[in-house]
């Protein structure tokens, strides 16, 4: 887990910022073991965020405090520990690796929990989820079941 402790999420990147530029801006805080700018699989264009792993977790904390909210290549960046941001602010539409598609109904404990407990569950990327049957009368057994039949076989 030591490598995870030194791993930072960097969001709000300029689409032209690459690994080298990111490393150049953060290397003054200490030795870096890995720099990744996440790219779209098909277009290879930056998705506007990345990760930096410091060999020493204390260096990562120093970098996070100093660089969060700073400007990099003309964009204000957000820097946080990697584990926090992946679950917290970005967990909504993805629901923690798609587990929101289970039929449990409660969903407490999946993802961050911030989006799952909203009444009706609409507006946060869960439109296709089957967890909300009956809450809004849309895609459930009361409308004939034709939406659910394809998924239940």
Swiss-Prot record:
Q: Mind telling me which Gene3D superfamilies this protein's record contains?
A: 3.30.70.330
By its UniProt entry, which SMART domains does this protein fall under?
RRM (SM00360)
Residue numbers carrying Asymmetric dimethylarginine: 103
Q: In this chain, where does the modification Phosphoserine occur?
A: 133, 143
Cellular compartments annotated? Nucleus; Cytoplasm; Cell projection, Dendrite
Q: Where is the composition biased (Gly residues)?
A: 89-112
Q: Name one GO molecular function term.
A: ribosomal large subunit binding
Arranged from A to Z, the UniProt key words for this protein are: Cell projection, Cytoplasm, Methylation, Nucleus, Phosphoprotein, RNA-binding, Stress response
SUPFAM superfamilies this protein is in? RNA-binding domain, RBD
Q: Which GO terms describe its cellular component?
A: cytoplasm; dendrite; nucleus
Output the GO biological process annotations, alphabetical, semicolon-separated. miRNA processing; positive regulation of translation; regulation of translation; response to cold; translation
Q: Provide the RRM domain boundaries.
A: 6-84
Q: Which InterPro entries match?
A: Nucleotide-bd_a/b_plait_sf (IPR012677), RBD_domain_sf (IPR035979), RBM (IPR050441), RBM3/CIRBP_RRM (IPR034278), RRM_dom (IPR000504)
Question: Which residues are modified to Omega-N-methylarginine?
Answer: 47, 103, 118, 128
What segment(s) does the record annotate as region Disordered?
81-153
PROSITE patterns with a match to the protein in the record = RRM (PS50102)
What is known about its processing and modification?
Arg-103 is dimethylated, probably to asymmetric dimethylarginine.
Q: For the modification Dimethylated arginine, which residues carry it?
A: 103
Q: According to its UniProt entry, what is the function of this protein?
A: Cold-inducible mRNA binding protein that enhances global protein synthesis at both physiological and mild hypothermic temperatures. Reduces the relative abundance of microRNAs, when overexpressed. Enhances phosphorylation of translation initiation factors and active polysome formation.
The subunit field of the Swiss-Prot or TrEMBL record says: Interacts with RPL4. Associates with the 60S ribosomal subunits in an RNA-independent manner.
Protein's name according to its UniProt entry: RNA-binding protein 3
Higher taxonomy: Eukaryota, Metazoa, Chordata, Craniata, Vertebrata
């Amino acid at each position: 887990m030591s490598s995870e402790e030194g791993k930072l999420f960097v969001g709000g990147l300029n689409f032209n910022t690459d690994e080298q530029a990111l490393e150049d801006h953060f290397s003054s805080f200490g030795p870096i073991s890995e720099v990744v700018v996440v790219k779209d699989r098909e277009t290879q264009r930056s998705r506007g965020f990345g990760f930096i792993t410091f060999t020493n977790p204390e260096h990562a904390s120093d970098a996070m405090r100093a660089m969060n909210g700073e400007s990099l290549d003309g964009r204000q960046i957000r820097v946080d520990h990697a584990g926090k941001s992946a679950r917290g602010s970005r967990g909504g539409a993805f629901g923690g690796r798609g587990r929101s598609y289970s039929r449990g109904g409660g969903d407490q404990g999946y993802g961050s929990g911030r989006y799952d407990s909203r009444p009706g569950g609409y507006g946060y990327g869960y439109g296709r989820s089957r967890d909300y049957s009956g809450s809004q009368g849309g895609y459930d057994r009361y409308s004939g079941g034709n939406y659910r039949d394809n998924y239940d076989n």
